[in-house]
């Protein structure tokens, strides 16, 4: 029987529910259990695909082409699992499916209401994740905080789950904040008491508390919280601010979190405890890196940390392999000019230009890429970065001065980057991109193929609607550009490289989505190898 763990949050947002859920997932997985991660987002958008990165952060893409919350990236990187369309559900998706059923007459004339129709659809999404994965454990994170009006249907649905699948098969974990008042040098438990009271008022009694705090919580405060919340003191877990993300699962294990979860759910794991030795070595390496490598990231959304979180994480993963700390200098593309690019790049070991949409900042990206190419600074382009590298090459090597992308200038004479043929007639923005996992055939003798351990074919995740214009392929090749990765039918350019440079590779896909702390993605691995000049070191 599948076990269901629901992770909720109270007091404030951004408490780290996703990290808590991921860390528990990692511990259970390392006990030999099959774990599926799931995130419920209470916003009414169908998905985050059309949302402003400044509001939502990065849009994560799964193998099956789902545009999802960035927490799925945490799940994949920390737990080392692959997520899917069943892993991210929004209020918008729920209402869309319910309304489609109503229009088809599936409800046979009944009045469609939040209870039972919306809550039943939410439960169906939870159950579907279990049925499609055959998992031992489903860990579902509920976005927002307890008491939010948007989260109410989700809270009601998970309350009902206890009755539907049995009390022994459901566990509620509630994350709260225990703030420290510096003026009084005192920790306050009242916010946690109120948050749990709110949760209990809707019929959910938490079975475990995870307390976020700046410093360790003494026994007196834990006893007080236990008295007020009816949660046994041995199931109150501290989540102290940690210097490294890798510390969190290890700290949870020290407190016996995974064992307590297994005991509560009567869950027998293949291994008596989580084997975290490899994780400990990774944590030790991450804390004691002996070198530094500076990478300049030129992007459109650099003011928000979460906008490029998979990219910066992938850079760090590669850094662990080379025993080097990656210092990422984020530069707003709009601020770059021919006059200041040398100053911006003077101490940089490498340049990365990640994905994005729209026309803002494109000229700054092109200027930065030109500087990297002319000065043989290792360069990695991703999605929009690949497109701008192509435009830069056309302008400054092929001397096509008006070369551009059709996204920036639809009527451009030399549109090096053009809209994909099957996307020309699309009227909507949402859900109309080339999304998900696609194969690419790698050319023999290229640095790209070497980066992927000489594989013939790779599978990578995409999110774009523009592509390289094939009518320029011959001219590019004559000028020295190598198309080192193409679609199996040779119709789509997936990767370009300049073989005479130290490292100048750009990909139409998003390699960052498949990077893992213990398995850096191929292009990132080779990019940091070239930028650092260091030998790889096994963990």
From Swiss-Prot:
**What organism is listed for this UniProt entry?**
Lactobacillus acidophilus (strain ATCC 700396 / NCK56 / N2 / NCFM)
Activity regulation (UniProt): Allosterically activated by GTP, when glutamine is the substrate; GTP has no effect on the reaction when ammonia is the substrate. The allosteric effector GTP functions by stabilizing the protein conformation that binds the tetrahedral intermediate(s) formed during glutamine hydrolysis. Inhibited by the product CTP, via allosteric rather than competitive inhibition.
Q: Which PANTHER family match?
A: CTP SYNTHASE, CTP SYNTHASE-RELATED
UniProt miscellaneous comment = CTPSs have evolved a hybrid strategy for distinguishing between UTP and CTP. The overlapping regions of the product feedback inhibitory and substrate sites recognize a common feature in both compounds, the triphosphate moiety. To differentiate isosteric substrate and product pyrimidine rings, an additional pocket far from the expected kinase/ligase catalytic site, specifically recognizes the cytosine and ribose portions of the product inhibitor.
Task: Outline the subunit composition.
Answer: Homotetramer.
Q: What is the official name of this protein in its record? A: CTP synthase
Q: Which reaction does it catalyse?
A: UTP + L-glutamine + ATP + H2O = CTP + L-glutamate + ADP + phosphate + 2 H(+); L-glutamine + H2O = L-glutamate + NH4(+); UTP + NH4(+) + ATP = CTP + ADP + phosphate + 2 H(+)
Which cysteines form disulfides? none
User: Has keyword Transport?
Assistant: no
